[in-house]
Regions:
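Phosphate/pyrophosphate-binding active-site segments
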Residues: 154-157, 180, 318, 322-412, ...
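Short alpha-helical "patches" and their helix-cap loops
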Residues: 26-27, 362-365, 460-467
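Active-site diphosphate/adenylate-binding microenvironment
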Residues: 29-43, 371-457, 608-610
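Active-site-proximal structural scaffolding
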Residues: 250, 289-290, 391, 475, ...
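Thiamine diphosphate
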Residues: 120-134, 331-332, 340, 347-348, ...
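N-terminal alpha/beta PP-like core and its mobile active-site loop of ThDP/TPP-dependent enzymes
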Residues: 1-356, 397, 401-404, 460, ...
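Glycine-rich beta-strand-to-loop/alpha-helix junction loops that act as flexible
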Residues: 233-235, 299, 412, 467-470
Length: 611
């Protein structure tokens, strides 16, 4: 079958299927594209000829559409993958940040970018960055640091090797992440006689690797000796779809469950085992459990510093760590007893072997008091009378007004901590906070990807994205993409006049507020952005609201078929307090007394760190 490289690539993608909700669907359901001279005539032409089998959506910004691809795969629990294609040069490098988001969060995304000519005859070509000492190097090599699999296709027949490697990387529960293929412009249109069987339909299944029996036995021994065990639920618990197994395990053995940002919505807030968020963006009641626990059972968690309080949170000198993870690298961190296997299967196996084991009764009973304290703290902090509403008050109102079917999304700035603390999960897999890479702009673009996931799979409910004014200004153009594609999204734009959470970081560590708030300008009257007018200019239904009118306007937005943007002024310095120690770089040689005090607090905090 004589095909060009581009035609063969698209044909192969179309043949890849997966079973999802008892239906066979495309593993690559669509592509995001911004076409330029590096991909329009080769890959672009092949996509156009197959526009029904693999629809192509046009983005406005390469980073934005790639972030949408990341959020799509997250909403689909890594069971489907979007394709992203760009031209060469700036179009390609614009995707590097989004690739890093996928890499940090262990999420699949396929990136296909144009490259220079393999023949080198027309060099240097438009948008080529020349390396005088390495003619084979192009800017596409920058993706090596932010992808799980990287290749440059120099001959059409190389697809026979690289595409199977690509698909296995995207499907691998342990090594899942972004894949990058560089496609030289001349190679895109070169032909080869491909074997027909290469394009036969394949229905994939994501593997559930079982743990080694010796690691299970060792973990059983440790758990049985523990009096105060604590489970930390991470994102891997969700991707394994271990929701009911985790709940059953925790409640059967009387173990509290605290959650990371990625693990939120594994358990419902109504689950008796649920005890709130842990770590730097967590709450004091949950962190107290972590401090006292003699055993940490990490389920699908990569144990980031925001989870572990920069490894100062687990204060019990006798504590041990068991880590359940498909990825060896994550499972073995900090000398943990590693259970390298699927979370769902591992919990079932552990549960079947623990017999009559129970956590210490007084420890199990703490679950009730901890939950009560978490809920009481939410009520207390959201009842305060303020001149402008706090993030917490806005989050609580949106939470109460949302349905069980709705999906909330956020990313960088102060909102992750506020949602992590004040959002009570009503249904499983209904929460997405991108805090693996904490990428500003994900809130806008990611919501588009999540909406595509919801709408393509026929799920009820709305995608509600909470975004700060700083993130909005950084990357907002995919609002237009969502409008033009007919998607339905609600954006809650919280305007606190700048990067207020970084101002908080500055001032709480002795520094002065510097270039974080928009009024810190050399102009007497810096410009205030009219966010309502801006969103309207991209076709969104936009309104300025207050805390008092927000519920009514949210109801109206939920009945609107398109994109809505509700703008609300929020307090720049009222935050949810609590959390854990976080190591940051504070000068040890400053003459400023406040910075000296902050440095001393850092030294004191780091002294509590355990292996």
């Amino acid at each position: 079958m004589k095909l060009t490289t581009s035609e063969a690539l698209v044909k192969y993608l179309i043949a890849q299927k997966i079973q999802l909700d008892n239906k066979v669907v495309s593993f690559f359901p669509f592509a995001f594209a911004i076409f330029g001279h590096g991909n329009a005539l080769g890959l672009g032409d092949a996509l156009e000829r197959n526009r029904k089998a693999i629809p192509t959506l046009r983005g406005q910004n390469e980073q934005g559409m790639a972030l949408a691809a990341v959020a799509f795969s997250k909403a689909q629990l890594r069971q489907q993958c979007a394709v992203v294609t760009t031209s060469i040069g700036p179009g390609a490098t614009n995707v590097v940040t989004a690739a890093a988001v996928a890499m940090a969060n262990r999420l699949p995304m396929l990136i296909l970018s144009g490259d220079t000519f393999q023949s080198r005859r027309p060099d240097p070509v438009l948008q080529q960055v020349e390396h005088f000492d390495s003619p084979i190097t192009t800017v596409n090599d920058s993706f090596r640091a932010v992808t799980k699999y990287w290749d440059r296709v120099n001959r059409p027949e190389q697809l026979l090797n690289t595409l199977p490697n690509m698909i296995q990387t995207l499907l691998d529960p342990a090594d899942c992440g972004p894949v990058f293929l560089a496609l030289p412009q001349d190679v895109q249109v070169e032909t080869f006689d491909f074997p027909e069987e290469f394009f036969k339909e394949v229905i994939h299944q994501i593997r559930r690797p079982r743990a080694d029996s010796s690691s299970i036995s060792k973990a059983i021994e440790i758990i049985k000796s523990a009096k105060k065990p604590l489970i930390i639920a991470g994102g891997g618990a969700r991707y394994s779809q271990a929701h009911s197994e985790l709940s059953e395990f925790a409640n059967k053995f009387g173990i509290a469950v605290v959650e990371t940002v990625a693990g939120k919505s594994t358990l419902l807030a109504s689950d008796p085992a649920w005890c709130g968020p842990v770590g730097v963006t967590g709450c004091d009641p949950a962190n107290k459990l972590a401090e006292e626990a003699d055993l940490i059972i990490s389920v699908g968690c990569r144990l980031q510093d925001f989870t572990t309080g920069s490894w100062t949170l687990f204060k019990n000198p006798a504590h041990k760590v068991i880590s359940i993870n498909t990825a060896r690298f994550d499972a073995t961190k900090r000398n943990a007893v590693a259970i390298i296997g699927d979370a769902k299967e591992s919990l079932v196996e552990l549960g079947s072997l623990l017999g009559s084991y129970k956590a210490e009764l007084a420890w199990s009973d703490k679950r009730v008091s901890t939950r009560d304290e978490v809920l009481k703290n939410i009520q207390t902090r959201t009842s305060e009378k303020l001149d402008l509403p706090s993030y917490a008050q806005v989050v609580k109102l949106i939470n109460e007004a949302s349905s069980n079917e709705d999906y909330v999304l956020t990313a960088a700035g102060g909102l992750p901590g506020e949602l992590n603390n004040n959002w009570l999960t009503k249904s499983k897999d209904s929460f997405d906070c991108e805090y693996g890479y904490s990428c500003m702009g994900y809130e806008i673009a990611g919501a588009w990807g999540a909406a595509l996931a919801y709408e393509s799979s026929g799920r009820a409910g709305k995608v509600i994205s909470m975004v700060g004014d700083g993130s909005y200004l950084m990357l907002n153009s995919e609002i237009l993409s969502a409008v033009n594609n007919g998607n339905s999204i609600i954006y809650i734009l919280c305007d606190n006049k700048g990067f207020a959470v970084i101002q908080r970081l500055q001032t709480s560590n002795g520094s002065k507020s510097f270039r974080t708030m928009f009024n810190d300008s050399d102009l007497d009257k810096p410009v205030n952005v009219d966010f309502v007018a801006h969103a309207k200019s991209m076709g969104a239904n936009a309104k300025k609201v207050t805390l008092e009118s927000l519920k009514e306007e949210l109801t109206s937005a939920k009945n609107y078929a398109g994109v809505s943007v509700l703008v609300i002024d929020t307090h720049p310095s009222k935050w949810t307090e609590g959390g854990a120690f976080w190591e940051v770089g504070v000068s040890g040689s400053s003459n400023d007394s406040e910075i000296q005090s902050a440095h001393a607090r850092q030294v004191e905090g780091k002294a509590k760190r355990r292996l």
